[in-house]
Structures are given as structure tokens and as C-alpha cells.
Curated annotation (Swiss-Prot):
Family: Belongs to the LRRCC1 family.
A UniProt-annotated Pfam family: LRR_4
Keywords: Cell cycle, Cell division, Coiled coil, Cytoplasm, Cytoskeleton, Leucine-rich repeat, Mitosis, Repeat
Protein name (record): Leucine-rich repeat and coiled-coil domain-containing protein 1
Domain of life of the organism encoding this protein: Eukaryota
Keyword Thylakoid among record annotations: no
Keyword RNA-binding: no
Biased composition annotated in UniProt, kind: Basic and acidic residues: 318-330
Signal peptide: none
Residue intervals of the LRRCT domain: 175-218
Length: 1032
């Protein structure tokens, strides 16, 4: 543990010296942790792995500001929270948990990868705040969840502009959405930014995710190949090269010209960088792939360390083989000594990374920190230009060859010359060098001013480039909206066609329903007739019951009167008894006063005698009462038997009378009902004619309104088409401007590189002159010690630079991809827009012709449909009214039945009233016979009237049926014609759609071929550049 802590502290010190943020990894896999608060995590961590624990809540991570990778898979987390402060988080793994909703990701601006597989998620509303350009989410894994709504999925994913990889199904584990028909096509249409869906590309070809994961490792392997292939001594740092160069200067006329520096374009560096670091997006899906990647990284690190050790050994060998003789020169002036110190201080640290890799890294650093470079251009310069100049001077310039010649001449000079000659030659050389320095300083000042102006121009061009990028983003959004509007219009056309088909089907159904309604109306009329008959019968029965109830009520009144009289009598008797009791009490008191008191024995004897007498009397009374009770019970039984016989006789008589009366009443009801039915038929026929006339008027008004609305929609569509054409022309102009700006940018970059290389060459000359005058043996020894210390520090810097190189390479790959996609989309859009303009013009002409025909036909159909629909509505209203009446009548029937049952019970209880009814029945019979005669005469008359009315009704029904049949035949003929015409239009439209699809497929095939040819050319160029670099 102490050794690990020491290593971490040493790395932190090295990184703080270099100016980079501290970083570290922590892994607590399968440790049985219950919560994150049990750990004391450092705020400088950038990766935390808590896989396979028992954590149920995300907490205690707020203080880790620099966290970039977080793995909380295989835990018991049910909610996403506590991540608001982790703004630098790039990857988040929450697979194999208990999460049901995606939320709490609003503040994660740098999040690029999200793995939420193997959960219970059915709500993705937490992805809506991540919409827009601010968030950069590229990879989402959602397989093995509970997402069942495709509408909700698309609503949450549409705004994720950088999303390129979406996984909803993997290795048989999917979501309910994946089982819907056409799921893949719908998602790819609505999310055009997707490149990979369910581990398959846009064309349905399977994609190997392990290859994508290992693309980062391929980048490092390419760097190692360049390291191994470079045989030139470029691994030595710049300070060592400067110190070991000979102290003899070359004149300014013999320096490398500007054209030689300008002839080395920066595009070659970029192409070599693109060939080394291919586009890759790291995707970590399985732990096995992660382990393999870590093993490969360790191997690469070991190889890099071996190469560094070899280069250090080669440097030591060079030092041993080529010992330099010490110069016997002294420090001439304090100013020269100060300049030398400043030069030594300002020389930045150099690493042992080869030329190719270091130029890549420094170019990236220059692109990232361009604004800071402008602000402090006088203090520090980008290191890649220095190395370019050093490498070019070592490889191409004849400077070293010329410097070796005077060196040999100095070694071979005879020591016999006097000291005077040497002193004079040194003074002359000093004067020449001072003049050259003065000229160089003036040229340097001029070049510095010129560089400031160039930086200003570069800043302005960068602003223009940013504006161009913004305009391209806006153009993409506009094109996306246009595609969506076009899709919506096509959907609207399909919907209208489907609605027309549905309306035709509904017409046929409405006709069938009308016939069914007519049949149903007839059946309802029959049922109404039956109900009216039953109602009349019930009314007659009610009248009878009411009469019976009235008779029973009168009998009950009589009984009540008798009971009241008996009550009055009993009350009088009770008053008399009270008076008698009061008199007896008074007499008893008087007797008690007059009586003489006996002794106890006499009193008991007298009491016993009287008790015996009273008991005998009481027994005799009980026997007499019992005999009377027996006699009365026999009489009561005899009376009950007689009463039952009388009741049966009267019931039979009453039943016979009741049957006769009911038969007569039914015949009367039938005759009256026939009359009423005939009158209703006449009224209904007149009301139907009035309703039909009103319906025709209303339908005409509705048709006029529909035609106006259609004209307005057509005008709106034409206006939208015109606006879209204007926008397309603007897009073309802007694309041309963007291309011109790109060409200008490339030219300016090449000019800047040439001029900066020139400036750096002049500075190196100045350093060389300073070292020639001030170099001594003691300074060489000190410099050697310093360089050895620097080599150790640079080996540490190498590791940090390698990490930054990886992140920078990823950023550059992404930018290159975006630029390629933009260029391809702009070219495709140009071709598609030209074809679409011609096609839209043709379609507009055809659509206008079709709209005219269809409007006329739709007007006629809509009028007919409105008439039929209004008829159906009225029939439905009548049907509902009849149902309500039926329900009311059923309720009345139930109430009548209940009343009837109660009355029957009372009638059975009060059967004593039947004796009074006999006299009334006889009178009713006489009246009934008279009524029968009158009713028979009325019946004969009603039968004759009924026959006449039925003849009239039959004639009216025949005429109405003929009219309805004629109208139905005309409607059917018109519908058949319209159906044929619409079928022809649909067939023609389908043919056009097939033609357009064929053209689009041909275009896609051509673009694929062009892409393949371009890729082959790029590979050839990359191979050629690698060969050139190896030759260098």
C-alpha cells in the first residue's frame, strides 16, 4: 500500500509540473458494499468501478468534480440521482439494477455513453432535457427493459442530435417495442442521426462492437510502428542537439531559404495523423473486452519503455564516440551571459517521442489553445514548429556538413601560431557576429509584427468558420424540418385517401343500417301496438281494482265506526267500574272501622274457612266457563266451514263475470288501436317529407363550407412550397460560401506554418551564435547533468503526453467525421434538390388537375352522405325515445303489479265484503248487456273505417318504396364510378412512388461506390505518406 501511495504521489507531482489535472482509478468490484458513503473517495479521481455490490442509492459522489467514468452495474439501485455536480462525466454504466425511470441526467453535459440495460425501465422522459447541441450523448444501451410505446421512445430520442448508436435488442434480450411491425424502419426514419441500431448499421449489416472498442488500441499500435521505423536520431531532445552542435556559425546567406520551409505543407502532417489515428469511438460493453484492452495497453506501454531505453542508450553511445574538445574561450560580456541564461530557461522540456507522434500532439495542442497562443505569442511559441525546423535542419540543411569542415580545420590547426594571431581572429569574428546579431534582431522584430497581424487575420477567419458551422447546423435543422413536413404531408395524403375509402364503406354501411332501422321501426311499431293493448287492458283492470278497493274502503269505514262505538261503550263501562270500586272501598273502610279486632288464632280460622269457600266457587266458575268455550268453538268452526263454501261459490261467479268483461274490453281496444295506428301513419308520412326537405337545405350549406376550406388548404400548401424553394436556394448559396471559406482557411494555415518556421530558424541561429561565444568545458559538464535530470522528467512526461494524445486524437477523429458527413450531405442535398424541384413541379400540375376532379366528386358525395347521416341521426333519436318510453312503461307495469298483489292480499283478508257485492253484480250485468249492444254497433263501424284506411296506407307505402329504390340505384351507380376513378388515381400514384424509389436506390448505390473509391484513394495516400516518412 505504501508503495502504491508513493507511485500515486509521484504521478501527481509530475502532472502538476506539466500543468495537467490529477487523475486516478479506483476499483471495488464484488466487495459487498451496502452504500458508497462507506468509502472515502478522493476528489481527484477520474474513474470509479463499483461493479457487483449491494448499493441501493447513489450518494457521496458530489465532491468528485473530475470524475469521467462511473460503473455502478449489478447493484440494487432503483433511482438515478446525486449526479448533478459531475459535469465532466463521460461514461455511465447502470446495467443490472432495479431502475424504472430514466432521470437526473440534466447536468451531465459531457456524457457520451449511457448503459441502462437489464433494468425495469418503461419511462424515458429523463432524456428530454438532454435535447439540443449542449449535450453530446452518442451511445445508449437499453436492451432487456420494459419499453412498450414507440411514440414515447421517439419523443424522447428525437432531440439527441449526436446520438449515433442505440441498442434496444441484443443477444435475444429485447423490449416490447421491438416486437412491433416496422419498428426498425420507423426509428431509422425519425432518427436520421443514427448510424447503428441494435448492433446493425443502416443497411441491416451486423456490426462487431469489439472492433470498435479496439480501434483506440490500433491508434497506439500505429504510433509504435512509427517509433520503430524511425531510424534517424530524432529521439534526442532539442537541448542535446543544440549543445552537441559545433560552435561554428554559418553566414545568413547560407541559411535555408523560406521557400524550402513553405514547401512543407501542414496537410501532409494532418494526412499522416489521419492515417495513424483512424476514427474510433470507445465502447465498453463486456468485462472480457475491457480486460483484453487493458492487457494490450500494458504491452504497448512496455514496448514504449523499451524504445525509450534504447534511445537513451544510443544517446550515451553517441556521447562516448564523439567527444567534443573544450573551447578555450571566455565569457565576453555580461549581456551575452544573460542571454544564454534566458535561452536556457525558456527552452521547453522535450520528450523522446518520435517526430510523427509529437507533431500530431503539438498540432492538436495548437488547435485547442489557439486563443491563448495569440495572447502570449512573444513569451512562448508552439513547440511543434521548433521540432519541424530542427528536423528539417538535421535532414535537409547542409549546415552540419559545413560546420564539420571548420571543426576539422580547427582540430588540425598547428599549435605553433602565436597568441596574437588567435586574439585578432577572435576579435574579428566577434565584430562580425555582433553585426549579424543586430541584423537578425531587426528582422526578428519585423517578423514579430507581421506574425501579430497574421494571428489577427487567423482569429477573424476562425470566427467566420464558427459562423459557417452554425449556419450548417441551422441548415441541417431546416432540412430536417422540411423532411418532417414532407413526411407529414404524405401522411396527410394517405389519411385523406383512407378517409375517402372509409367514407365509401360507411355509406354502404349506412344504407344497410337504414334498411335495418326501417325493419327495426316496423318491429317497434308492432311492439308499440301490443304495448298499447296491454296498457288498455291494465287500465281496465286498474279501474276494476279501484272499484273493489273503494268498496273495501267503505266496508273498512263501517268497521271503524262500529269499533269506535264499541270503544265508547267500553269506556263508559270502565268509568262505571271505577265508581263501583270507589264505593266498595268506602264501604270496606267503614266495615274495618266498625269491626272488632280478633286474636290471631280466631282470625286464622275465619280466613281458612272463607278461603275454602272461595276456592269452591272459583272451581265451579272455571268449569262453567270451560263448557261455554267448547260450545262457542264448535259454533265458530261450523261458521268457518259455511263461510268457506260461500266464498268458493262467489269466487266462481265473479271469475265468470270477469272473463266476459275482459273479452269485450280486448275487442274494443283492438278496434281503437287500429284507428289510432292509421292516423299516426298519415302524420308520420307528412313529417318525413318535411324532414327530408330540411335535410337537403342543410347539406347544401355544409357542402359550400367544405369546398371553401379545401380551397384555403390548397392555397396554404402552395405558399409553403414557395417558401421551401426560397430556403433551398439560400442553402445552395451558403454551401458555396462555406467551400470558398475552407479553401481560404487552408491557404492561410500553410502561409502561417511557413512564416513561423522561418522565425524559428532565425531564433535557432541566434542560440547557436550565443553558444559559440559562451561555451566552455565547465558549462558542458553542467549541461550534461541537467540533461540527464531532464531525461528522467521527460520519461514521466511521456506517459502524460500519451494520455493527452489519445484524448486529442479522439477529438480530431470526431471533427473529421463531422466535416466528412457535412460535405457528403451537402453534395447529396444539392443533387436531391435539383431532382426534387423538377419532380415537385410535375406533381403540382398533376395535383391541381386531380384536386379539381376530386373536389367536384367529393362535393356530390358529401351532400349525399350528409343527407343519409341526418336521416340516420333522426332514426336513432326516435329509437332512443321509443326505448325510453318502453322503460317507463315497464316501470309502470311493475308498480301496477305490486299494487295488484297488495290489493289481492287485502281482498283475501276482507272476504266478508263479497256478500254486499252480489247485489251490485246483478246491476252491473244489466248495464253490461246494454253496453255490449252499443259496442257491437261501434265495432262494425270501426271495421269499415279500418279497411278504408288500410287501402290508403298500402297505396302510400308502394309510392314511397318506389321513390326510395330509384334514389338508392342512382347513389350506387355514382359510387361505383367514383371508386373506379379513385382506383386509377391510386395506381398512377403508386407507379410514381416506385419510380422515385428506384431512382433513390440508384443514387445510394452510386454514392456507396464513390465512397469506396475515396476510401481506397485515402488508403493509398496514407500508405505513400508512411513510406515517405520512413524514407525521411
Amino acid at each position: 500500500m505504501e508503495a502504491a501511495a508513493a507511485v500515486v504521489a509521484a504521478e501527481a507531482e509530475v502532472e502538476n509540473e506539466d500543468g495537467d489535472s490529477s487523475c486516478g482509478d479506483v476499483c471495488f468490484m464484488d466487495k459487498g458494499l451496502q452504500s458508497i458513503s462507506e468509502l472515502s473517495l478522493d476528489s481527484t479521481l477520474h474513474a470509479v468501478n463499483l461493479h457487483c455490490n449491494n448499493i441501493s442509492k447513489i450518494e457521496a459522489i458530489d465532491h468528485i468534480w473530475n470524475l469521467q467514468h462511473l460503473d455502478l452495474s449489478s447493484n440494487q439501485i432503483s433511482r438515478i440521482e446525486g449526479l448533478n455536480t459531475l459535469t465532466k462525466l463521460c461514461t455511465l454504466n447502470l446495467s443490472c439494477n432495479l431502475i424504472t425511470k430514466v432521470e437526473g441526467l440534466e447536468e451531465l453535459i459531457n456524457l457520451t455513453r449511457l448503459n441502462v440495460s437489464y433494468n425495469h425501465i418503461d419511462d424515458l422522459s429523463g432524456l428530454i432535457p438532454l435535447h439540443g447541441i449542449k449535450h453530446k450523448l452518442r451511445y445508449i444501451d437499453l436492451h432487456s427493459n420494459r419499453i412498450d410505446s414507440i411514440h414515447h421512445l421517439l419523443q424522447c430520442m428525437v432531440g439527441l442530435h449526436f446520438l449515433t448508436n442505440l441498442i434496444l435488442e441484443k443477444d435475444g434480450d429485447d423490449n416490447p417495442v421491438c416486437r412491433l411491425p416496422g419498428y426498425r424502419a420507423v426509428i431509422l426514419q425519425t432518427l436520421p442521426q443514427l448510424r447503428i441500431l441494435d448492433c446493425k448499421n443502416i443497411f441491416g449489416e451486423p456490426v462487431n462492437l469489439t472492433e470498435i472498442n479496439s480501434s483506440q488500441l490500433q491508434c497506439l499500435e500505429g504510433l509504435l510502428d512509427n517509433l520503430v521505423s524511425s531510424d534517424s536520431p530524432l529521439n534526442i531532445s532539442e537541448d542535446e542537439i543544440i549543445d552537441r552542435m559545433p560552435v561554428i556559425t554559418a553566414p545568413i546567406d547560407e541559411l535555408v531559404p523560406l521557400e524550402q520551409f513553405a514547401s512543407t505543407p501542414s496537410d501532409a502532417v494532418l494526412t499522416s495523423f489521419m492515417s495513424v489515428c483512424q476514427s474510433s469511438e470507445p465502447e465498453k460493453n463486456n468485462h472480457e473486452n475491457d480486460l483484453q484492452n487493458e492487457i494490450k495497453l500494458q504491452k504497448l506501454d512496455d514496448q514504449i519503455l523499451q524504445l525509450l531505453n534504447e534511445t537513451s542508450n544510443s544517446i550515451d553511445n553517441v556521447l562516448e564516440k564523439d567527444p567534443r574538445p573544450k573551447r578555450d574561450t571566455d565569457i565576453t560580456s555580461e549581456s551575452d551571459y544573460g542571454n544564454r541564461k534566458e535561452c536556457n530557461r525558456k527552452v521547453p522540456r522535450r520528450s523522446k517521442i518520435p517526430y510523427d507522434a509529437k507533431t500530431i500532439q503539438t498540432i492538436k495542442h495548437h488547435n485547442k489553445n489557439y486563443n491563448s497562443f495569440v495572447s502570449c505569442n512573444r513569451k512562448m511559441k508552439p513547440p511543434y514548429l521548433k521540432e519541424l525546423y530542427v528536423s528539417s535542419s538535421l535532414a535537409n540543411c547542409p549546415m552540419l556538413q559545413e560546420s564539420e569542415k571548420p571543426k576539422t580545420e580547427i582540430i588540425k590547426v598547428d599549435q605553433s601560431h602565436s597568441e596574437d594571431n588567435t586574439y585578432q581572429s577572435l576579435v574579428e569574428q566577434l565584430d562580425q557576429e555582433r553585426e549579424k546579431r543586430w541584423r537578425a534582431e531587426q528582422a526578428e522584430n519585423k517578423l514579430m509584427d507581421y506574425i501579430d497581424e497574421l494571428h489577427k487575420h487567423a482569429n477573424e477567419k476562425e470566427d467566420i468558420h464558427s459562423l459557417a458551422l452554425l449556419t450548417t447546423d441551422r441548415l441541417k435543422e431546416i432540412i430536417f424540418r422540411e423532411r418532417n413536413s414532407k413526411g407529414q404531408l404524405e401522411v396527410m395524403v394517405h389519411k385523406l385517401q383512407n378517409e375517402i375509402k372509409k367514407l365509401t364503406v360507411e355509406l354502404m354501411k349506412a344504407k344497410d343500417q337504414q334498411e335495418d332501422h326501417l325493419k327495426h321501426l316496423r318491429t317497434l311499431e308492432k311492439t308499440l301496438e301490443k304495448m298499447e293493448r296491454q296498457k288498455r287492458q291494465q287500465q281496465a283492470a286498474q279501474i276494476r281494482l279501484i272499484q273493489e278497493v273503494e268498496l273495501k274502503a267503505s266496508a273498512a269505514d263501517r268497521e271503524i265506526y262500529l269499533l269506535r262505538t264499541s270503544l265508547h261503550r267500553e269506556r263508559e263501562q270502565a268509568q262505571q267500574l271505577h265508581q263501583l270500586l270507589a264505593l266498595k272501598e268506602q264501604e270496606h273502610r267503614k266495615e274495618l272501622e266498625t269491626r272488632e279486632f280478633f286474636t290471631d288464632a280466631d282470625f286464622q280460622d275465619a280466613l281458612a274457612k272463607e278461603i275454602a269457600k272461595e276456592e269452591k266457587k272459583h272451581e265451579q266458575m272455571i268449569k262453567e266457563y270451560q263448557e261455554k268455550i267448547d260450545v262457542l268453538s264448535q259454533q265458530y268452526m261450523d261458521l268457518e266451514n259455511e263461510f268457506r263454501i260461500a266464498l268458493t261459490v262467489e269466487a266462481r261467479r265473479f271469475q265468470d263475470v270477469k272473463d266476459g268483461f275482459e273479452n269485450v274490453a280486448t275487442e274494443l281496444a283492438k278496434s281503437k288501436h287500429a284507428l289510432i295506428w292509421a292516423q299516426r301513419k298519415e302524420n308520420e308520412s307528412s313529417s318525413l317529407i318535411k324532414d327530408l326537405t330540411c335535410m337537403v337545405k342543410e347539406q347544401k350549406t355544409k357542402l359550400a363550407e367544405v369546398s371553401k376550406l379545401k380551397q384555403e388548404t390548397a392555397a396554404n400548401l402552395q405558399n409553403q412550397i414557395n417558401t421551401l424553394e426560397i430556403l433551398i436556394e439560400d442553402d445552395k448559396q451558403k454551401s458555396i460560401q462555406i467551400e470558398l471559406l475552407k479553401h481560404e482557411k487552408v491557404q492561410l494555415i500553410s502561409e502561417l506554418a511557413a512564416k513561423e518556421s522561418l522565425i524559428f530558424g532565425l531564433r535557432t541561429e541566434r542560440k547557436v551564435w550565443g553558444h559559440e561565444l559562451a561555451q566552455q568545458g565547465s558549462s558542458l559538464a553542467q549541461n550534461r547533468g541537467k540533461l540527464e535530470a531532464q531525461i528522467e522528467s521527460l520519461s514521466r512526461e511521456n506517459e502524460c503526453l500519451r494520455k493527452t494524445n489519445e484524448s486529442d486524437s479522439d477529438a480530431l477523429r470526431i471533427k473529421c467525421k463531422i466535416i466528412d458527413d457535412q460535405t457528403e450531405t451537402i453534395r447529396k442535398l444539392k443533387d436531391c434538390l435539383q431532382e426534387k424541384d423538377e419532380h415537385i413541379k410535375r406533381l403540382q400540375e398533376k395535383i391541381t388537375e386531380i384536386e379539381k376532379c376530386t373536389q367536384e366528386q367529393l362535393d356530390e358525395k358529401s351532400s349525399q352522405l350528409d343527407e343519409v347521416l341526418e336521416k340516420l341521426e333522426r332514426h336513432n333519436e326516435r329509437k332512443e325515445k321509443l326505448k325510453q318510453q318502453l322503460k317507463g312503461k315497464e316501470v309502470e307495469l311493475e308498480e301496477i303489479r305490486k299494487a295488484y298483489s297488495t290489493l289481492n292480499r287485502k281482498w283475501h283478508d276482507k272476504g266478508e265484503l263479497l256478500c254486499h257485492l252480489e247485489t251490485q253484480v246483478k246491476e252491473v250485468k244489466e248495464k253490461f248487456e246494454n253496453k255490449e249492444k252499443k259496442l257491437k254497433a261501434e265495432r262494425d263501424k270501426s271495421i269499415e273505417l279500418q279497411k278504408n284506411a288500410m287501402e290508403k296506407l298500402h297505396s302510400m307505402d308502394d309510392a314511397f318504396k318506389r321513390q326510395v329504390d330509384a334514389i338508392v340505384e342512382a347513389h350506387q351507380a355514382e359510387i361505383a364510378q367514383l371508386a373506379n376513378e379513385k382506383q386509377k388515381c391510386i395506381d398512377s400514384a403508386n407507379l410514381k412512388v416506385h419510380q422515385i424509389e428506384k431512382e433513390m436506390r440508384e443514387l445510394l448505390e452510386e454514392t456507396c461506390k464513390n465512397k469506396k473509391t475515396m476510401e481506397a484513394k485515402i488508403k493509398q495516400l496514407a500508405f505513400a505518406l508512411n513510406e515517405i516518412q520512413q524514407d525521411m
